[in-house]
């Protein structure tokens, strides 16, 4: 099946395990967001590289702010509920999961390591030495942060950029990696919460990388695409082109800023504004009829009428500013020209009209990115 979740899960990087009772292979992933905690269990599908979901659990997230654990007890309860529900629906017992990690402390850097060839052909030992030096460079660049993932970007030998340098001749061999860093404190706290919920952390996958693997085809990764994952309190962006990561960034703002704008403009609570946004939100001014009103009733209170024109204008103005910031971010990072397509995902991408707002402000093709399991690569571990 092809399923669109409230948040995109890191399916390509989840862990292969054996069901204790039936001896079947299955996969488990855990995504702990500010708004929701989701746990997915899947099994290899009939087609090579595809997966079939056999169980899912979700819970309202508590104890997490901007992707970071702030209350261990509440976070553990949310994780435990999602994991137990996933185990029940899948009829399996999980011992470990791959966990997506993000938050405002996630950072990235492009790093290079090299080795001198002295005119000789590139050997396997040269490749390993260049890769080792690239890893050391990434650790130095992190300045004390934990390296979450190193993504190989290829090799350069002389004027040639390649994925397979063995046998080439040149003065030196350079290995390029894209490093993603996270807060060691947050990673440790997240691990403890997951363990207290009853499962082990097999490994972490950065949210931006996981989202890109889940929503982009191989063609899109080659031609150039930016994935903007709009969470509740954070937004991540990753640019892939020529099959490589060009840029990654996480900002401490998300879909909640739209909610806060509505609350301030309409003079209502954040809870009421969130409900109003979910039920009647829209970013396209063309969808407003003159004099149209929205009838809103919250928790049994007397219904109230709000101007739909004011509601839509508020959300449209925020969307315009939001995507203007990301356009400028990509320009400043010299990544804008690599992008042919923008893919929106995460809970914030469900706001009606947001894709049109992004296209108008960024000047790129835009689509909403549900997971398509047909192009995912199953893990080998």
Give the label of every model feature segment:
Residues 318-327:
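A general structural motif
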Residues 374-380:
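Conserved small/polar residues in nucleotide/adenosyl-binding loops
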Residues 223-265:
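Glycine-rich phosphate-binding loop of actin/hexokinase-like ATP-binding domains
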Residues 197, 361-362:
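Short, structured coil segments at secondary-structure junctions
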Residues 39, 99, 194, 229, ...:
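Residue-level signature of catalytic and energy-coupling elements of molecular machines
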Residues 35, 281-284, 338-361:
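Glycine-rich phosphate-binding loops at beta-strand->alpha-helix junctions
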Residues 328-341, 345-346, 368:
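Hydrophobic alpha-helical bundle architecture
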Residues 3-36, 40-226, 244-246, 255, ...:
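Nucleotide/phosphate-binding catalytic cleft detector across ATP-hydrolyzing
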């Amino acid at each position: 099946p092809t399923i669109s979740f409230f948040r995109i899960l890191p399916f390509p990087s989840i862990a292969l395990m054996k069901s204790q009772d039936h001896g079947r292979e299955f996969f488990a992933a855990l995504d702990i967001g500010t708004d929701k905690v989701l746990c997915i269990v899947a099994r290899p599908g009939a087609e090579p590289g595809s997966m079939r979901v056999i169980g899912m659990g979700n819970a309202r997230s508590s104890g997490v702010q901007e992707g970071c654990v702030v209350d261990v007890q509440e976070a553990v309860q949310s994780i435990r509920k999602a994991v137990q529900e996933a185990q029940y629906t899948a009829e399996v017992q999980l011992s470990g999961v791959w966990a997506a990690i993000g938050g405002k402390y996630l950072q990235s850097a492009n790093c290079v390591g090299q080795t001198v060839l002295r005119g000789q052909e590139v050997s396997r030992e040269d490749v390993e030495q260049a890769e080792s030096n690239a890893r050391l460079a990434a650790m130095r660049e992190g300045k004390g942060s934990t390296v979450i993932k190193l993504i190989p970007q290829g090799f350069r030998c002389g004027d040639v950029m390649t994925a397979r340098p063995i046998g080439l001749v040149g003065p030196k061999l350079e290995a390029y990696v894209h490093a993603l860093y996270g807060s060691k404190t947050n990673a440790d706290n997240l691990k403890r919460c997951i363990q207290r919920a009853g499962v082990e952390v097999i490994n972490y996958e950065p949210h931006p990388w996981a989202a890109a693997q889940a929503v982009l085809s191989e063609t899109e990764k080659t031609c150039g695409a930016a994935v903007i994952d709009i969470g509740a309190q954070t937004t991540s962006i990753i640019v892939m082109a020529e099959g490589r990561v060009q840029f990654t960034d996480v900002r401490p703002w998300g879909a909640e800023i739209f909610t806060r704008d509505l609350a301030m403009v309409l003079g209502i609570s954040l809870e009421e504004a969130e409900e109003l946004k979910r039920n009647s939100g829209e970013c396209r001014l063309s969808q407003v009829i003159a004099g149209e009103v929205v009838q809103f009733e919250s928790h049994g209170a007397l219904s109230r009428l709000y101007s739909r024109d004011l509601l839509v204008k508020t959300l449209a103005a925020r969307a315009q500013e939001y995507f203007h910031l990301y356009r400028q971010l990509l320009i400043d990072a010299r990544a804008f020209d690599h992008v042919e397509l923008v893919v929106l995902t995460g809970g914030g991408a469900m706001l009606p009209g947001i894709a049109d707002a992004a296209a108008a402000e960024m000047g790129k093709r835009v689509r909403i990115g549900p997971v398509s399991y047909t192009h995912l690569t199953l893990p080998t571990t």
